[in-house]
Every structure is written in structure tokens, then in C-alpha cells.
């Protein structure tokens, strides 16, 4: 290996978590040490570490760096170091408790699928808990997806929203009179395609990572409609309620991993643990079903 494991950890943490503060919190290392070490490693691979839009990124050809990351990933798996997991914000809390004591869990605030997929391809993270149906292609040569849970996606609003007053008579035509919170174009392509066909993807939130302040500030501009499931509706500071409308759209948690590591004993042990957690979620919530044989 060209660099020690803990030194590459510092660079990967900056790229993965986005900020020195978040990297410091996760690794329990001072921000100054992380920054100094990350720049040292970037220089070894002839890369430039820069900060743009509030997050750290690398400029240059990362081929050699990713080969080094590949070696470190194999060491991580074989030597028992904590695995690195990222999860879509809407589903992270469901599994966080069983993950955090054994593995390194990301900030779980990405509001797209492109960034987590890139982190998987570049060997920065080992597993991504993604949201169905926005997944890598089934024909993807590097990544494979294993279903955990499935459940309906709902429309949700604040308790004082005018649509709540319509009760069971509310319709999609009623909903279309209000902005429906959407993410940046292409962030969740399959979900976007379906909701656009219903006229329900029309008020973009200008944030790359989830934060309550930015999300709720956008939602407060006009009485808006959000998307939620039984597993995510409790994550917002302002209480939301479901509208009694069947969207006909299914979401759920999916375990995404590199094909080469799918059958590694540690990956299989983690998957088994998450399946047990999924069964508990299905037992707690009638809408949740599991995507595997129990």
C-alpha cells in the first residue's frame, strides 16, 4: 500500500462527509489533523483538494487513488475494521442503532443517488442502504442490489394544511393546486419520472444534503405537499400527516454492495443483521413487507 490506512481514512472522510467538522466528529480526530493529512495523501496521488459549494472535493485523475482505496477496502473487510455504510436519509434511522455500535455510518443526508453510487464505485464506502426504485441498473457490472423492505409512498402535509380540511374527499386535482416538494432534476430519476406523470414534482428544494432548516424554510414559502412513508414521516421537526390518496408507488430499503464483496462473510453478516431489523419493521408497521424469505 502506498499510504497507511489511517492516513487514507482522513482523505476519504473529507470527501465522504463533505466538511472537516463532520469528518472530525466521525473519526474523533481534530479538524486540523484531518486537513493536514488529507492534503498530504492527495499530493501523493497528484491530486488537488479543494472546497467548493461548502464541501471538499478532489481535482485530477483518481485512477491510482481508487486502486489504493480498493486495497484498503479489502484490508478493511478481511481484518475486521469497521465497515463503512451510507444510507439514504429517509431510511437511515430505521437501522442506525444496530449499525452505529459496530460500523462507521455516514451522515446519511445525501439527497440524490449519484453521490452514494460514486462512493461505492470508488471504494470509499462498503454498503449503501438505498431507496427503491432509485437503484443502480440490474445489469450494473460493479454493483448489486438486495431488497430489504417495501412499502407505499404517500403524500404528506402539515396538520394545518388546507388539504387536511377536505378529509377523505381530497383528490390529486386538489393536491396539484399546491407546490409538491421535489429534489434537483435527476436526483431520484425513477421516482421523479412517476411523480412527474402525476403532475406532482414541481417545487425544487435547492439543497444537496438534507437539513431541517433548509427543507422547512422552502416548505414554509407556501403550503406545500411532501412525500413520506411510514418509516420517514416522523423525521421532520414539524409533524406531518398523510393525505388519504393512493399514489400507486412503492418505495423501500435496498442493500447495495459491490458484486466482488457480496459473498464476503462480513458483508453477509451485516446483511443478515439488517434483514432481522427489516422483519422487526414489518412486524411494527402493517404497510411494510420484506423482500426476502424469512
PLM feature spans:
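Short helices/loops that flank or line small-molecule/ion binding pockets
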Residues: 26, 114-128, 212-223
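Flexible hinge/capping segments at coil-to-helix
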Residues: 148-153, 157-180
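Short beta-strand-centered segments that line the small-molecule binding cleft or hinge
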Residues: 115-157
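Short beta-strand->loop
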Residues: 142-153, 230, 237-252, 261-262
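A late-sequence structural motif
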Residues: 245-286
